[in-house]
A protein has these predicted regions:
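Acidic, surface-exposed loops and disordered segments
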Residues: 1-233
Length: 233
C-alpha cells in the first residue's frame, strides 16, 4: 500500500504498473530498446544501447518515438496511482541515454477520461494495418486533432477520396525532443482513437506519404504517417 509521501508511491505493485505501461507502447522494427528505472518519487526512461539496433534506426529516431509513446503511458499510470506527473525531456545532457523522467509531484485524482485511456492502454492496439474502411466522422477527427495538439504536435488531415482518413503527425522543429513529443502524440492518438472506435495504423517513415509535406506549416516537420478508420457504427 502506498504511503502518503511521494517517495513512497513507487512500491512494488505500483512500480509494476509503470513497467507494464512502458512495455505496451508501440514500436516498429521489433525494437524494445528502452528500459525504465524506478527511483523514489521518480521514473526514468532510458535508451538501452545493448538492445538498440542502429542498423534499423541509425538516428535513433524510431527509438525516441517509441519511448515518447511509453512516456505517455507512464503519465497515465502516474495518475492511476494518485500522483501528478511532471515530465522532463532529455533532463541530463551528461547522460545521453536518459531520455525522459516522470516525477510524481503531488497527490491528485485521475479524471474519468484518464481512467478510460489507462484501461485501453492495457490492451494491445493495432499498429500496422487498419481494420475498417470508412473515414471517421469529422467531429471525431477534430477530437483526435485536439488530443494530438495537447501533446505539442499537430495532426494534419490529408486529402483522400474514400477509404480511411490519411493524416500526418507533425512537430515544430526536429530532433530528439521533437521525436519524444511526437511519440507521446502518437500514443494519445492511438488510445483516444480506440476509445472512439477508430483504428489507427502508423508508419514512422513519413517519406512514404509525399502529400504530408504539402499540409505542413512553415517550421513543421512530419514525424508519423497515420491512417484512421472507423471500426463501428
Amino acid at each position: 500500500m502506498a504511503t502518503p509521501t511521494v517517495a513512497g508511491a513507487l512500491n512494488e505493485q505500483n512500480a509494476s504498473r509503470f513497467v507494464v505501461a512502458g512495455a505496451l507502447a508501440p514500436a516498429l522494427y521489433d525494437i524494445r530498446a528502452s528500459r525504465l528505472r524506478a527511483l523514489p518519487g521518480l521514473v526514468e526512461v532510458h535508451a538501452d544501447p545493448v538492445r538498440f539496433r542502429a542498423a534499423a534506426d541509425p538516428r535513433a529516431r524510431g527509438l525516441h518515438l517509441s519511448c515518447g509513446a511509453a512516456l505517455f503511458n507512464l503519465r497515465l499510470s502516474s495518475a492511476q496511482v494518485g500522483y501528478e506527473p511532471v515530465v522532463r525531456l532529455l533532463p541530463d545532457r551528461g547522460h545521453p541515454t536518459l531520455l525522459a523522467s516522470v516525477r510524481l509531484a503531488g497527490p491528485r485524482r485521475s479524471h474519468p477520461e484518464e481512467r478510460l485511456l489507462y484501461a485501453t492502454s492495457l490492451r494491445p492496439l493495432p499498429g500496422r494495418q487498419p481494420y475498417g474502411d470508412q473515414r471517421p466522422p469529422l467531429p471525431v477527427l477534430q477530437e483526435l486533432q485536439e488530443a494530438v495538439r495537447l501533446e505539442g504536435a499537430t495532426l494534419h488531415l490529408l486529402p483522400r477520396s474514400g477509404g480511411p482518413q490519411t493524416a500526418a503527425i507533425a512537430t515544430s522543429g526536429d530532433g530528439p525532443s521533437a521525436w519524444l513529443r511526437a511519440g507521446q502524440a502518437l500514443q494519445s492518438l492511438l488510445l483516444h482513437g480506440a476509445v472512439r472506435a477508430v483504428s489507427v495504423s502508423f508508419l514512422y517513415e513519413v517519406s512514404r506519404v509525399p502529400r504530408a509535406l504539402e499540409a505542413l506549416q512553415p517550421g513543421e516537420v512530419p514525424q508519423v504517417a497515420v491512417d484512421l478508420a472507423r471500426t463501428g457504427l
